[in-house]
Amino acid sequence: MVEFYINGQQVEVQLEDEQTVGDVLKSFESTCEENDAAVIGIAVDSKQITAELFDEEAAKPLGSNTKFEFSIVTKNDIKASFEKLSALFNELAAQMEGVPVALQSGKNAEVSESIKRLADSIEQFCHVATLASLFPDTFSTGSLNGISFKDFFAEFSPILKDFEDALQNNDTVMLGDLSEYEICPRLKEISKALQSM
């Protein structure tokens, strides 16, 4: 019996006239498109199907015990992720506003943790933005005040590096200025932009 798993969950699928692995993959892709979803990973009989292997694997005949495992993402998943990131960036903006006071109170570890969360959040944003590119009709307006997200983060990265350097050098004046006047406003911009996606 042919088995199907979507995001780790077994599902019942009715095959029609599919004869090859490729027929099944094409049919599944069409179904995903009809349901505002995109395939981001495929395994057939526990073998990951990469772009290099796709044509070779697709030509194989469909066996009676073939196991298909699909990883998919939906537009709604991406919207929900952007909403969570918006709230997270807003929360981080508030934390960054409090950096000068935290430093004066000797809470350097708290400040370091905020920066780590910020870096993790930016990495998470980049991952979600990459997935969003699978739906260009829905998520094509990725910009902040007319600047692409890519350019925005290219400008933001040196500021974060300066903040990290100031933290290592215990330069509380620089840390306060960067967090209050550079980082916090940018986090608010990101949060606002993500709310409208």
Where do the language-model regions lie?
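Alpha-helical oligomerization segments
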Residues: 154-197
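Long amphipathic alpha-helical segments with strong coiled-coil/leucine-zipper propensity
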Residues: 33-140
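Short, charged, amphipathic alpha-helical segments
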Residues: 112-117, 150, 174-181
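Amphipathic alpha-helical coiled-coil segments and their boundaries
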Residues: 78, 111, 142-145, 149, ...
